[in-house]
């Protein structure tokens, strides 16, 4: 039996991170991008790097730069960074967690913050997944 607190090998951490990112986060990012486009915003989801970062970029049609929500791995610390950047005021908010932080509740909370604070919007799909009074 292995110690659950023992760190994973870097290779195993990166593999689990990539699998979790694609299985849990990517579909939620794609749905948020679709909702954003339906609300008249320009939105794009992309990955970059190794280990991959998943990024949702959103901008108003009049904006030349995008606000974003990015999930990235910190292999040295074996943690995940959830990063929100708001182009309107240049602020960044970062939430650190373990691999288990790549879940619908954390991602929905971050997406809700990005759209509420960055664009004054509520995403219908996020609102539908959570009961009234959740936020």
Regions found by a protein language model. Name each.
Residues 31-79:
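Amphipathic, interaction-prone secondary-structure segments
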Residues 102-135:
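Amphipathic, soluble alpha/beta structural segments
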């Amino acid at each position: 039996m292995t110690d659950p607190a023992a760190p994973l090998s870097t290779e195993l951490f990166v593999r689990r991170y990539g699998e979790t990112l694609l299985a849990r986060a990517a579909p939620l990012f794609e749905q948020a991008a679709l909702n954003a486009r339906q609300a008249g915003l320009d939105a794009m989801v992309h990955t970059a790097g190794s280990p991959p970062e998943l990024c949702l970029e959103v901008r108003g049609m009049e904006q030349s730069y995008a606000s974003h929500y990015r999930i990235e791995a910190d292999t040295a610390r074996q943690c995940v960074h959830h990063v929100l950047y708001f182009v309107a005021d240049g602020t960044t908010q970062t939430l650190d967690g373990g691999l288990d932080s790549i879940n619908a509740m954390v991602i929905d909370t971050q997406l809700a913050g990005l759209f509420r604070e960055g664009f004054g919007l509520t995403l219908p799909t996020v609102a539908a997944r959570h009961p009234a009074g959740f936020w």
